[in-house]
Amino acid sequence: MALQRTLSIIKPDAVSKNVIGEILTRFEKAGLRVVAAKMVQLSEREAGGFYAEHKERPFFKDLVSFMTSGPVVVQVLEGEDAIAKNRELMGATDPKKADAGTIRADFAVSIDENAVHGSDSEASAAREIAYFFAATEVCERIR
């Protein structure tokens, strides 16, 4: 097992349902520590830049529109195999295919409004964390 960091975003649909605390509790109960967090209202430029890898995909415009429709909570999670653990907690991208008890099965309504985002690899995690946080904003959690 390896100590990792991963980026997690609680998306506008979950923020508007007021389930931020419930989602964070799931991360912590699974052994993940929040080492950076903030609520932000993304601009079109910020959302478009974050999801730039999808720019040529047909859903890109709708994704940017959704991600700017309300505030999001962006956090860095740290723990043993944090990337895989977070993705397991999130569940399948399509909440209809997500296992019962996962974040998306419990809080998402559609593949478009699917409650959370999580990094899919160490390279993505490093890039995504740097997109939202300066190194000085990520705290060491020794205790």
From Swiss-Prot:
Compartment annotation: Cytoplasm
Keyword ATP-binding included in the entry's annotation: yes
Database matches in SMART domains: NDK
Alphabetic keyword roster: ATP-binding, Cytoplasm, Kinase, Magnesium, Metal-binding, Nucleotide metabolism, Nucleotide-binding, Phosphoprotein, Transferase
KW Transferase (keyword) present: yes
EC number, as in UniProt: 2.7.4.6
GO cellular component, one term: cytoplasm
Reported effect, S69C: Decrease in autophosphorylation. Strong decrease in alginate production
Any GO MF annotation of the entry: ATP binding
SUPFAM superfamilies reported in the protein's UniProt record: Nucleoside diphosphate kinase, NDK
Gene Ontology BP annotations: alginic acid biosynthetic process; CTP biosynthetic process; GTP biosynthetic process; purine nucleotide metabolic process; pyrimidine nucleotide metabolic process; UTP biosynthetic process
Listed Gene3D superfamilies: Nucleoside diphosphate kinase-like domain
Outcome recorded upon mutating H117Q: Lack of autophosphorylation and of kinase activity. Strong decrease in alginate production
UniProt xrefs under InterPro entries: NDK-like_dom, NDK-like_dom_sf, Nucleoside_diP_kinase, Nucleoside_diP_kinase_AS
Post-translational modification comment from the UniProt entry: An intracellular protease cleaves Ndk to a truncated 12-kDa form that undergoes autophosphorylation almost as efficiency as Ndk does.
Major localization listed first in the record, in broad terms: cytoplasm
Catalytic-site annotation from UniProt: H117 (pros-phosphohistidine intermediate)
Effect of A125R: Lack of autophosphorylation and of kinase activity. Strong decrease in alginate production
Coiled-coil regions listed in the entry: none
Function field: Major role in the synthesis of nucleoside triphosphates other than ATP. The ATP gamma phosphate is transferred to the NDP beta phosphate via a ping-pong mechanism, using a phosphorylated active-site intermediate. The 12-kDa membrane-associated form synthesizes GTP in preference to other nucleoside triphosphates. Important for alginate synthesis.
Family stated for the protein in its record: Belongs to the NDK family.
Protein name, as recorded: Nucleoside diphosphate kinase
Gene (UniProt): ndk
